[in-house]
Amino acid sequence: LFRSRENQSKAYYKEFLKLQAERYYPSTLTLQMYMLFATHLNIGTPETLDLFRSFAEDIKQYPKYDGTRIVWVHLLPFYQETLKHYFNLNRDYQIQCTEMNLDYMDELDTTHPLEALATKMLNNLYNGPYEKKANMVVKLAKEMHADGVINFCHWGCKQSAGGVFQLRETLKAADIPLLVLDGDAMDRRNSHDGQIKTRLEAFLEILDKERNSSC
């Protein structure tokens, strides 16, 4: 039953993401981070199933989106003032999803639960070469019709910093713009707002110009 609810939850989440590729849906940096509880720690519970079901139904009430779409990679510094200004409940700029919530979306074999969990662990996005993650980000950006990708390199995280070059080259080959931000996702004392503000606004300006020129 638990694994069955997990499959149902993921089905609703996929339905939600398919709709969000074209629609506006209010969100915040904090909500995107808290989704990790639903997609990982609490996946399979009745409450999480209700949550994803409500997402899939609720988004149908929202209008088509004509702003700038962003796919976020790795952690979100939810306290950062500039990022909050641009991505918290903003109709012009929308973070559609983060790859951390989509590290394994295949359906589980409920008739063989232990084998299903083993497969889930072995085939997880973070198990294996970084190339797997880079290719997944490209696929996700295309599916979400993203205008660009932002990768946040959390200080001390070798995985996020070490794979940036490969991610950049993979996205470049797919003609998808990438912004790499460095900082501390947890400790606001290590946040350099001036640098983040300058680089983010320049990146968003480029995306806006490209999107407007293609309209």
Predicted feature residues:
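Polar low-complexity intrinsically disordered regions
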Residues: 1, 214-215
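A charged, amphipathic alpha-helical module
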Residues: 2-99, 104-107
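Hydrophobic alpha/beta core scaffold segments
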Residues: 88-94, 99, 112-120, 124, ...
